[in-house]
From Swiss-Prot:
Annotated keywords: Ribonucleoprotein, Ribosomal protein, RNA-binding, rRNA-binding, tRNA-binding
One GO MF term attached to the UniProt entry: structural constituent of ribosome
InterPro entries linked to this entry: Rbsml_uS13_C (IPR027437), Ribosomal_uS13 (IPR001892), Ribosomal_uS13-like_H2TH (IPR010979), Ribosomal_uS13_bac-type (IPR019980), Ribosomal_uS13_CS (IPR018269)
Gene from which the chain derives: rpsM
Official protein name in the record: Small ribosomal subunit protein uS13
One cellular component term from this protein's GO annotations in UniProt: small ribosomal subunit
UniProt function note: Located at the top of the head of the 30S subunit, it contacts several helices of the 16S rRNA. In the 70S ribosome it contacts the 23S rRNA (bridge B1a) and protein L5 of the 50S subunit (bridge B1b), connecting the 2 subunits; these bridges are implicated in subunit movement. Contacts the tRNAs in the A and P-sites.
Record's keyword annotation contains RNA-binding: yes
UniProt subunit comment: Part of the 30S ribosomal subunit. Forms a loose heterodimer with protein S19. Forms two bridges to the 50S subunit in the 70S ribosome.
Record region (Disordered): 93-121
Length: 121
């Protein structure tokens, strides 16, 4: 099992899909990395030589922000929005949808479980 950027890649998958298990690398980025390192998309993760794995590690480390660093950067960006007091920051702070979705119905993912407001008497 190849370990790249602190993530164990699944052995049986093709390397182009295996790299997408790393946070911050999608299929497009995966293919760009493989093109730069000269590795075939069809190769399986368990077929990688140590030199090829090292080349992929080097390419990712030098040119891409992945895993913990990327998560930290995203969290800092959201915190900066909240500190600025921007509209998007306020929506993040209140736990509401940020990108203009309606909230009268739906938005349950952001709002959480329904909370009943007292009945009229």
């Amino acid at each position: 099992m190849a370990r790249i950027a602190g993530v164990d890649l699944p052995k049986k998958k093709r390397i182009e899909y295996g790299l997408t298990y790393i946070y911050g690398i999608g299929l497009h980025t995966s293919r760009k990395i493989l093109d730069k390192t000269g590795i075939s998309y069809d190769k399986r993760v368990h077929e990688l030589s140590e030199d090829e794995a090292a080349a992929i590690r080097k390419e990712i480390q030098e040119n891409y922000m992945v895993e913990g660093d990327l998560r930290k950067q995203v969290a800092m960006d959201i915190k900066a929005l909240m500190d600025l007091g921007s509209f998007r920051g306020l929506r993040h702070r209140k736990g509401l949808p940020v990108r203009g979705q309606k909230t009268k119905t739906n938005a349950r993912t952001r709002k959480g479980k329904r909370k009943t407001v007292g009945a009229k008497s």
